């Protein structure tokens, strides 16, 4: 069986560990083959991916799911990475999402996509040391998802009534264990005033998407806490955001733990100016850089059944 899952951008300003948006910029492919066996055995294959089960988000999530249902099988798991890792695009989450979605289909577990999030998020332990559900939820469910509870996990898809595209500015800045490092930079204590400001941003963002109000979304795509604390990881961001707003983007934010910047644009935005000048900012910082123009995507899907 072949299953695919799309990339995603998490946080979206003030929605740290709450919001993530699935988009069609990139996709991961999982090929999974299962045979009857007296014991559970998983073999990982793929170029440029960890082959150890406990170091690979897809195999780690798959193992958690199969153990929970006491499934014994010989599994061959081939991972074809289309989503670049370490750039804030939900790479590890997409692989984990595709793996558990495939297992659910093969073993006819009849679990909902929401139920699968509980297992897919465990795969993030392999990549970042903590089981955060935002990216995996987006890749599994599709669209914009909000994490409403973490134990037990509850996620809901947020209605999107605004037409937009996402310009992803992708600098090739490689930081060892970046997601783990970025999570360690999150402040343990914050001023109440900053908390209130962020809560207002998050409310504005959600209302903007639901009501189709670009000005509310623009206000909501801000953050006074996490992005500020992590700014040393992506010094290019403030200038790119400034340029984006100058040329009437809906808004801009750091995609996940960065360094990718997500710029939300529509028919009012000067996309060419935004793109050209944003790429120039990356060059000024000495970064090799590329871009993608993406649309909101659906969740994981089966491409081929064997």
Swiss-Prot record:
Recorded GO molecular functions are: ATP binding; homoserine kinase activity
Swiss-Prot/TrEMBL keywords: Amino-acid biosynthesis, ATP-binding, Cytoplasm, Kinase, Nucleotide-binding, Threonine biosynthesis, Transferase
**Compartment annotation:** Cytoplasm
- Keyword Secreted in annotation: no
EC number, UniProt record = 2.7.1.39
User: Where along the chain is ATP bound?
Assistant: 84-94
Record field: catalytic activity: L-homoserine + ATP = O-phospho-L-homoserine + ADP + H(+)
Task: Enumerate the Gene Ontology biological process terms.
Answer: threonine biosynthetic process
What PROSITE patterns does the database record attribute to this sequence?
Answer: GHMP_KINASES_ATP
Q: Does the keyword Amino-acid biosynthesis apply?
A: yes
Q: Which GO terms describe its cellular component?
A: cytoplasm
Q: In which pathway does it act?
A: Amino-acid biosynthesis; L-threonine biosynthesis; L-threonine from L-aspartate: step 4/5
The family assignment reads: Belongs to the GHMP kinase family. Homoserine kinase subfamily.
Q: What does this protein do?
A: Catalyzes the ATP-dependent phosphorylation of L-homoserine to L-homoserine phosphate.
PANTHER family tied to this protein: HOMOSERINE KINASE, HOMOSERINE/4-DIPHOSPHOCYTIDYL-2-C-METHYL-D-ERYTHRITOL KINASE
Protein name in the entry: Homoserine kinase
What organism does the record attribute this protein to? Sulfurisphaera tokodaii (strain DSM 16993 / JCM 10545 / NBRC 100140 / 7)
Protein's gene: thrB
């Amino acid at each position: 069986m072949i299953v695919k899952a799309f990339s995603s951008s998490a946080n979206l300003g003030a929605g740290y560990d709450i919001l993530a948006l699935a988009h069609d910029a990139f996709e991961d492919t999982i090929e999974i083959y299962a045979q009857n066996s007296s014991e559970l055995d998983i073999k990982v294959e793929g170029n440029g991916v960890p082959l150890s089960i406990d170091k690979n988000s897809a195999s780690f999530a798959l193992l958690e799911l199969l153990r929970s249902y006491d499934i014994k099988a010989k599994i061959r798991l081939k991972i074809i990475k289309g989503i670049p890792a370490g750039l804030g695009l939900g790479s590890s989450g997409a692989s984990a999402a595709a793996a558990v979605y495939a297992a659910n289909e093969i073993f006819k577990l009849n679990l909902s996509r929401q139920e699968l999030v509980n297992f897919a998020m465990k795969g993030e332990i392999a990549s970042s040391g903590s089981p955060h559900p935002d990216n995996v939820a987006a890749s599994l469910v599709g669209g914009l998802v909000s994490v409403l509870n973490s134990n037990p996990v509850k996620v809901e898809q947020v209605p999107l009534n605004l037409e937009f595209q996402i310009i992803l500015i992708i600098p090739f800045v490689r930081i060892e264990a970046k997601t783990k490092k970025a999570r360690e930079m999150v402040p343990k204590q914050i001023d109440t005033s900053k908390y209130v400001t962020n809560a207002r941003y998050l409310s504005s963002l959600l209302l903007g998407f639901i009501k189709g109000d670009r000005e509310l979304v623009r206000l909501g795509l801000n953050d006074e806490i996490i992005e500020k604390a992590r700014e040393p990881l992506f010094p290019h961001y403030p200038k790119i955001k400034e340029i984006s707003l100058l040329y009437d983007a809906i808004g801009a934010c750091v995609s996940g733990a960065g360094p990718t910047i997500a710029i939300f644009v529509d028919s009012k935005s000067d996309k060419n100016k935004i793109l050209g000048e944003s790429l120039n900012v990356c060059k000024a910082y000495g970064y090799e850089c590329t871009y993608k123009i993406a649309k909101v995507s659906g969740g994981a899907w089966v491409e081929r059944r064997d």
